[in-house]
A protein has these predicted regions:
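A conserved acidic beta->alpha catalytic loop
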Residues: 35-47, 63-66, 91-94
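Active-site nucleotide-sugar/metal-binding loop of Leloir-type enzymes
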Residues: 74-86
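Short, well-formed alpha-helical segments that are part of the catalytic scaffolds
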Residues: 9-29
Length: 278
């Protein structure tokens, strides 16, 4: 690409079934950078075989204890050669549409100060196939290599590293990220909830992780933990115009006035929280 070298990078563990396909779709990029975090299913051996035939394939195996997604992602990003300008970070079960590079080139030519590109994701095993605006946030996985880092131990996301200048994120409806999720793969809700609880104990003001924990309590109908967690979210979240904030406000008001099972302590906590932010 005339706007600089490119690299697709991601982490994996025991995902041997996806390696060949991911490498095929990532072939147009200058580099393919894969971090194996402890596979035991033959993934690492297969990667070594491919790397022996592909000078643009950079691989490493490293385990992390304790596990944090952002730490692994940061390490993976650091593996990307320093001369790379644009990075793409599709998971191993995700593939960018074949028009991605040419579309990026046109977009960057038209908007030279762009720092990241968001796109729609197609979840082919989901009832809601297209993930993108206006109903959902688009996927932000295309970014300048030198200007972003990974943040949050779970449900990690890219974060702008500069304080003296602003990022410029551009949405492109011509690029698609296809999510070919393994419907047979066992989900890991217990691990995720454990990590969210640990983060909440260490850093109760981290509203990014707290939101997912609140949502888990809500779905589980666990009022005992939901109410104090939701109240803390409203207390610490600075964006009072967000949908998350407004939805929690409405739900706590409804609980306060209509939920018959609330005890006096729960009602008092809700009232104090609502009074403090109105």
């Amino acid at each position: 690409m005339k706007h600089g070298l490119t690299a697709a990078y991601t982490i994996l563990k025991n995902e041997i079934k996806y390696i060949e396909k991911w490498l095929y779709y990532a072939k147009p990029f200058t580099y393919r950078v894969l971090l194996d975090t402890g596979s035991t299913d033959g993934s690492w051996e297969l990667l070594q075989e491919y790397a022996s035939k592909d000078a643009g394939l950079i691989i490493e195996q490293k385990t992390f204890d304790p596990w944090r997604f952002d730490v692994a992602r940061k390490y993976n990003l650091a593996m990307v050669p320093k001369n790379v300008v644009w990075c793409l970070s599709p998971d191993l079960d995700e593939y960018y549409s074949i028009n991605t590079l040419e579309t990026m080139e046109k977009l960057i030519t038209d908007i030279p100060d762009v720092t990241s590109i968001t796109s729609d994701r197609l979840d082919i095993y989901s009832r809601t196939v297209r993930v993108g605006p206006p109903n959902f946030m688009p996927t932000n996985k295309i970014h300048l290599r030198a200007d972003y880092t990974w943040s949050q131990p779970i449900y990690e996301h890219l974060a702008w590293i500069h304080k003296d200048r602003y990022e410029k994120e551009v949405y492109c409806d011509e690029i698609y990220l296809v999510h070919d999720q393994d419907f047979k793969k066992q989900e890991r809700p217990e691990l995720y909830i454990k990590m969210l609880r640990e983060e909440y104990q260490k850093n109760p003001t981290n509203t990014w992780c707290l939101w997912f924990l609140v949502y888990h309590f809500y779905k589980s109908e666990n009022l005992e933990e939901y109410i104090p967690a939701a109240c803390n979210y409203l207390k610490f979240d600075k964006n009072r115009n967000s949908n998350n904030y407004k939805d929690l406000m409405k739900d706590l008001i409804m609980l306060y006035h209509h939920e018959q099972t609330l005890n006096q302590q729960q009602k008092l906590l809700i009232k104090q929280t609502l009074d403090s932010i109105q």
